[in-house]
Amino acid sequence: MQLSPQEKDKLLIFTAFLVAERRKNKGLKLNYPEAVAYISGLILEGAREGKLVAELMSEGQTWLTRDDVMAGVAEMVDEVQVEATFPDGTKLVTIHNPIQ
């Protein structure tokens, strides 16, 4: 299988997202890399589903709460940026203060 560097990055994000999602579903609090991977994965999936950048930026602030993450993680994640492929091209999605 031949993958471009961007495709490898997306595959790595998605793999980390699956680990984070599994841990969240078990009721475990996410650490910093897991929280970022979880949000990033949902951005990529939303883009694939055809959601708009504005929708993802708005929804992104509801995906995780302070109760979902370990102490101090919410303060460490002030924004998450991911290049996602939308039906009309690749766009940078930025979610400010994603953990409320």
Curated annotation (Swiss-Prot):
- Record's Gene Ontology CC terms? cytoplasm
Q: Which reaction(s) does the protein catalyse, per the Swiss-Prot or TrEMBL entry?
A: urea + 2 H2O + H(+) = hydrogencarbonate + 2 NH4(+)
User: Which keywords fit this entry according to its UniProt record?
Assistant: Cytoplasm, Hydrolase
Q: Which GO terms describe its biological process?
A: urea catabolic process
Q: In which pathway does it act?
A: Nitrogen metabolism; urea degradation; CO(2) and NH(3) from urea (urease route): step 1/1
A Pfam family of this chain? Urease_gamma
Give EC number(s), comma-separated: 3.5.1.5
Q: GO MF annotations for this entry?
A: nickel cation binding; urease activity
Where does this one sit in the cell?
A: Cytoplasm
Q: What InterPro entries does the entry give?
A: Urease_gamma, Urease_gamma/gamma-beta_su, Urease_gamma_sf, Urease_subunit
Identify its protein family.
Belongs to the urease gamma subunit family.
Q: How does it assemble?
A: Heterotrimer of UreA (gamma), UreB (beta) and UreC (alpha) subunits. Three heterotrimers associate to form the active enzyme.
Protein name according to UniProt:
Urease subunit gamma
